Regions:
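Extended, low-hydrophobicity, polar/charged segments
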Residues: 1-228
């Protein structure tokens, strides 16, 4: 039917949620409008909603691990501010996102911190699936309330120094070396942070949102985005 109508379409992988079982496929006409954002490859048959699409990590760094260094970063809270102040690329920073995750029983919850490279964007669907909870069970945490329990400090949170908190680490960070991360202390960051030596994640998985131009997870060609 799609072909007879002259439509450009793909069989698209879609996410079914943490409780939904296996991945689903749906036929979508590619256009500039539509309910879903779709990542697709013109060099192979890969097509998936951006919520579902796997992200190809950068190659592991071959740098030697440098000594951990605590540095003053007065008032520098965003990735852009920190990167500019320390004169490093955003890809050499670690971004922290803080969440409150509700349990099955009323009033039950835990805190979680997700960490991705500073130049990447968090894919909320991947995070929710990694936590194994319904979508409505996850919300951004109040920084002050979470800080009182876990040691997180708004704008200066990193994976080192947190406690009573589930740490979810994007898989790409495990192969990157000498990154900048918050020191869990106001106005301070750490330089030369390395996974394994300085911190570990309770969950390590792909947390990244795919963008136009990123590598196709099947063939490696640049992906494109459309609606459908």
């Amino acid at each position: 039917i799609f072909t007879r109508c002259g439509l450009v379409f793909r069989a698209v992988e879609a996410d079914t949620g943490a409780m939904g079982g296996s991945v689903s496929h749906e036929f979508c006409a590619l256009s500039d409008v539509g309910e879903s954002e779709i990542a697709y490859c013109e060099q192979c048959d890969m097509a998936a909603t951006t919520e579902r699409a796997a992200f190809v990590d950068d190659e592991p760094s071959q740098e030697a691990e440098l000594p951990l260094e605590k540095v003053l970063t007065p008032g520098k809270k965003t990735i852009e501010e920190v990167a500019d102040f320390l004169k490093v690329d955003r890809s050499k920073t670690i971004k922290a996102l803080l969440f409150k995750v509700y349990g099955k029983n009323e009033g039950e919850f835990e805190y979680a911190a997700a960490f991705i490279r500073g130049d990447r964007e968090l894919n909320m669907t991947k995070l929710i699936n990694a936590l194994g909870v319904p979508e409505h069970a996850v919300e951004f945490a109040d920084e002050d309330a979470m800080g009182a329990v876990t040691g997180a400090v708004g704008g200066f949170t990193g994976p080192m120094g947190l406690h009573d908190c589930k740490i979810i680490v994007d898989s790409e960070l495990t192969g990157q070396k000498n990154l900048v991360a918050g020191a869990c202390e106001a106005d301070y960051h750490f330089k030369n942070v390395n996974y394994g030596r300085d911190y570990k994640g309770e969950i390590v998985t792909d947390l990244k949102l795919i963008k136009a131009g990123d590598r196709c997870p099947v063939c490696g060609a640049p992906v494109k985005l459309a609606r459908g």
